[in-house]
């Protein structure tokens, strides 16, 4: 059975509404409607759990301080003990995009004399961005000579220091509890909504707070993709294409298969997907029938989005304005 036939009769959202006035780099409010009864709760709860546990982020994973062998130590010239310094470092929120997958980064710091050690001091190059640079780490007096290395890694969820001890190779390295998740809070609400004369449909309102290293809309998109990939294992049948005439050659069959795909299979950016949702375009066949002028009517439209769509279509041998197929 084709996807179109499978979804026939289901009321489902065509687009997501963004509260552009209230949204910030750390907060986003999203509204989707209508859903069949029960679906808004299912989707809202699934998104919330995935957002809180499975979005990748960066955190400090281990430290090494010159002259210190364990966390129950004191450093000459530093007001805070090592335990307090570690607790403060655990609160640092970091944006780090490695050049290679799973690549960690070592930050080397040398702080001498009186002053304050703040999170912003960790931004030693352009690959590191500290989201809370004013966070206090330690207070140094004129006798201080703090030399330390910090390891930054990417990961998911919460990883306790105990789990990292087996991977420590350098003497004096102290593992740190890592809170990788950039999502700090997620709240969803399900309420009734009306479609024509029926008021038993549902509206999903989703609010997301992040530390700023990932925008709320990107976090939601990542969570949705993670859920989608986990659900594909439960699809144990193939989408069947409509019966075709024997005279259709292989190229025609390939074209029809491409046109019947959902637009999400183009692997578009969040902004481009929002353009398609606002125009109620669900399938590639619907997309190629539109002209470039029609696409510009979306409030989410930009030249960059149009260029991305044109490139994605061209890889399938398609383009805008195709009406005769």
Curated annotation (Swiss-Prot):
GO cellular component: cytoplasm; DNA-directed RNA polymerase complex
GO biological process: DNA-templated transcription
EC number: 2.7.7.6
Residue segments, region Alpha N-terminal domain (alpha-NTD): 1-238
Pfam families tied to this protein: RNA_pol_A_bac, RNA_pol_A_CTD, RNA_pol_L
Region (Alpha C-terminal domain (alpha-CTD)): 254-325
UniProt xrefs under CDD domains: RNAP_alpha_NTD
InterPro entries (alphabetical): DNA-dir_RNA_pol_insert, DNA-dir_RNA_pol_RpoA/D/Rpb3, DNA-dir_RpoA, RBP11-like, RNAP_asu_C, RNApol_insert_sf
Entry keywords, A to Z: DNA-directed RNA polymerase, Nucleotidyltransferase, Transcription, Transferase
Alphabetized GO MF terms: DNA binding; DNA-directed RNA polymerase activity; protein dimerization activity
Catalytic activity: RNA(n) + a ribonucleoside 5'-triphosphate = RNA(n+1) + diphosphate
Subunit structure: Homodimer. The RNAP catalytic core consists of 2 alpha, 1 beta, 1 beta' and 1 omega subunit. When a sigma factor is associated with the core the holoenzyme is formed, which can initiate transcription.
Function: DNA-dependent RNA polymerase catalyzes the transcription of DNA into RNA using the four ribonucleoside triphosphates as substrates.
Family (UniProt): Belongs to the RNA polymerase alpha chain family.
Notes on the domains: The N-terminal domain is essential for RNAP assembly and basal transcription, whereas the C-terminal domain is involved in interaction with transcriptional regulators and with upstream promoter elements.
The protein, known as: DNA-directed RNA polymerase subunit alpha
Naturally occurring in which organism (per UniProt): Leptospira interrogans serogroup Icterohaemorrhagiae serovar Lai (strain 56601)
